[in-house]
Regions:
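N-terminal domain-start signal
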Residues: 1-319
């Protein structure tokens, strides 16, 4: 078990060494589009995907996200119980994306999507069946009750509102609720951090829904858990009143709550002690400190999406 514990520490160190962080992000901001592509291909995207990269931005975005998922799913073999379930649910946000894409194809028609996100512990790994009906999807999900209900409730919402957007909205909200429910089974410190993270996710969604998808305020507020004690309602009103998307994103990214959450040194009080005790042989064999893992998974998620936004900006500059 001690060797397993050492492997977990080694994995975290190796992934942090290769991962994205504030310094690398600032460096990438100074590069042109081609420079960012080359850096990510050589340093972040997994070797097995590098030869599959195409020139278009969509391919790059896909393999950046897929590499993130494959790397972070490696932690699941070292985690147990509620901790393992929480990280798995966190990563399965992309399974919710897969399900929404499949349902869009079934409802609206079109070609079956080729680039779904398949990673160890995903609902569909290693291959997605060729679904053609809702019943086929529900049958496939019969052992995954939470995700089966997401599809059922999302489809009911689509039929009631007669607009596909509301299917996705319902499924996204149900995934967030599932993540929050799973966080309640964790240490209270972690639950509080998740609540703060969710409060910022709601505001980011408000920016996306209002400024990108052009939904009205009623639709935006329907997604948000207004009972979240850490929700900054003043910031929410500010981003909804922003004149454009860029201003809304800047308001969100520069907000005190988001900056504090991003910079929160979760390791100073826990993981440093964890590593010291491991060296002295005083730690229970097989234990892995959860907060550094969650911090890494969360921060990589943030920097991945920030980088993709940066790539899209660089493409626009070159047009």
């Amino acid at each position: 078990m001690l060797s397993l514990n050492s492997a977990a520490i080694g994995l975290l160190g190796a992934l942090k060494g290769k991962g994205l962080n504030s310094y690398r992000y600032e460096y990438l901001k100074g590069l042109d589009y081609r420079g960012i592509v080359n850096f990510m291909r050589d340093n972040f995207i997994l070797p097995e995907y590098r030869d599959k990269l195409e020139e278009d931005g969509e391919s790059l975005e896909y393999f950046i996200r897929l590499s993130y998922l494959r790397n972070c799913s490696k932690f699941l073999r070292f985690l147990k119980g509620a901790q393992r379930e929480f990280i798995k649910t966190f990563l399965r946000e992309y399974d919710v994306y897969n399900l929404k894409t499949i349902m869009r194809t079934i409802i609206l028609g079109g070609l079956y999507p080729q680039k779904l996100y398949l990673f160890p512990f995903s609902l569909f790994y290693p291959q997605v069946p060729e679904f053609t009906t809702l019943d086929e999807v529900l049958k496939f999900l019969r052992r995954e009750k939470e995700y089966k209900k997401m599809v059922e409730d999302g489809h009911q919402e689509y039929r009631r509102r007669e607009e596909y957007f509301y299917l996705e909205l319902r499924m996204d909200k149900m995934w967030l609720s599932l993540l929050r429910d799973n966080s309640r089974r964790l240490d209270k410190r972690i639950f509080v951090k998740v609540e703060k993270w969710l409060a910022m996710v709601y505001i980011f969604w408000a920016v996306r829904l209002y400024h990108i998808q052009k939904r009205d305020r009623e639709d935006v507020l329907a997604v948000i858990d207004l009972d979240n004690p850490y929700l900054n309602t003043a910031l929410l009103e500010s981003v909804l009143s922003a004149p454009d998307l860029e201003t809304g994103i800047k308001m969100f990214a520069s907000s005190q709550g988001f900056q504090k959450l991003l910079a929160d040194d979760w390791e100073s009080s826990l993981s440093d002690l964890f590593f010291q005790r491991e060296i002295e042989g005083k730690i229970e064999a097989g234990r892995l400190s959860f907060l550094p893992v969650f911090k890494f998974v969360f921060q990589q998620r943030y920097y991945v999406e920030n980088l993709i936004y940066l790539l899209n900006q660089k493409v626009t500059e070159n047009v």
